[in-house]
Amino acid sequence: MEILDGKIELPKGFVASGVFAGIKRSKKDLALIYSERLANISAVFTTNRVKAAPVILDMERAKKGKAQAIVINSGNANACTGEKGIEDAKSMAKKVAEVLEIEEEDVLVCSTGVIGVPLPMEKVLKGIEVAALSLSKEGGYDAAHAIMTTDTFLKAVTVKFNVEGKDITMTGFAKGSGMIHPNMATMLSFVLTDASVEKATLDKAFKNTVNRTYNMISVDGDMSTNDTAIVMANGMAENKAIQEGTYEFDLFYKALEYVNKTLARLIAKDGEGATKLIEVNVINAKTENDARLAAKAIVNSNLVKTAIFGEDANWGRILAAVGYSGADFDVDKVDIYLKSAKGEVKVCENGSFFAFDESLAKEVLKEKEIFIIVDMKAGEFMATSWGCDLSYDYVKINGSYRT
């Protein structure tokens, strides 16, 4: 598998664009993705009971498992906007269908930005016309920039692999920085591939990888109204349709998991005001669910986040998070390690105090990527979660978001 981190190379049959429509004060704010051929899709949405209008629309349209275009705007979430919000989301899809000469039902809509403000539809509809005229094979970068809100860098990856002599390309790009919490929050992710994949197979692969990647990240514990992750597979590589239980499926799954994992880590790394990426590895748990519960609790703990920001090896906060996570474990067996490029230090042994080198721990925590390893010593299962520290800048950014 060839890996192109940070690169967007649109697969066969896909074009994209990103333009300035005027929703935001400046910068690109409207993206369009189009496939020459109707594609199989799978999608996962926010679990927040308060769902944005485009999420409500997409959840219904995604049931048929087909789509040909996605329109995305940033700067306005079109959430908590009532029936008018639903009408506006439908109008966006209708406009895309008109300019691309495709079926309206084959258009998905995504929005991200400020909640509770109506969309400036005149600007949006005009922007869609411009975006359609701007579609190109090189337009992926513009599209990726157009979906960003408080993001500080582009989040993208492309992988290439071969299936039975057919070259497959898979590219993904995402946005997400704040209001990120396990089970999908304020993040949009789009994975495009020219592979031919059976619908049921695509569904299983995508939902499994989402569960192990996007659903294992946390920036601030807030859950958004707009989360959406979509994969489109248009089959234009002309390979035999991939089915579960085959060698070809294993290749496809590995590629999809890599793309989603890479994007999830980048989202965690770009947490609003973040100075450090945190990766939590819970190992030797009794069950996978126990490992997931513990890993998610640690990465979501504000006390752990602030300790990492302050470069304080406060292992008690880590153990406390495991304690309230709901995981089944014996506290008298738990070991905790802190690790980075500067080395590794054990800070807790068998659930209690361990005489560790404080100066080494301080050096370890000075790095930009910090690994927390929790050994439950209870079984064979493991889970990984990603997050970031919590800094003073997080408050500054979110205290003035609307201004």
Swiss-Prot record:
Residues engaged in binding substrate: 149, 175, 186, 272, 398, 403
Pathway: Amino-acid biosynthesis; L-arginine biosynthesis; L-ornithine and N-acetyl-L-glutamate from L-glutamate and N(2)-acetyl-L-ornithine (cyclic): step 1/1; Amino-acid biosynthesis; L-arginine biosynthesis; N(2)-acetyl-L-ornithine from L-glutamate: step 1/4
Site feature: Involved in the stabilization of negative charge on the oxyanion by the formation of the oxyanion hole: 112-113
Gene Ontology molecular function, alphabetical: glutamate N-acetyltransferase activity; L-glutamate N-acetyltransferase activity
Record CDD domains: OAT (cd02152)
GO annotations of cellular component type: cytoplasm
Disulfide bond entries: none
Record's function text: Catalyzes two activities which are involved in the cyclic version of arginine biosynthesis: the synthesis of N-acetylglutamate from glutamate and acetyl-CoA as the acetyl donor, and of ornithine by transacetylation between N(2)-acetylornithine and glutamate.
NCBIfam families given in the database record: ArgJ, PRK05388.1
Protein name in the entry: Arginine biosynthesis bifunctional protein ArgJ
Organism: Caldanaerobacter subterraneus subsp. tengcongensis (strain DSM 15242 / JCM 11007 / NBRC 100824 / MB4)
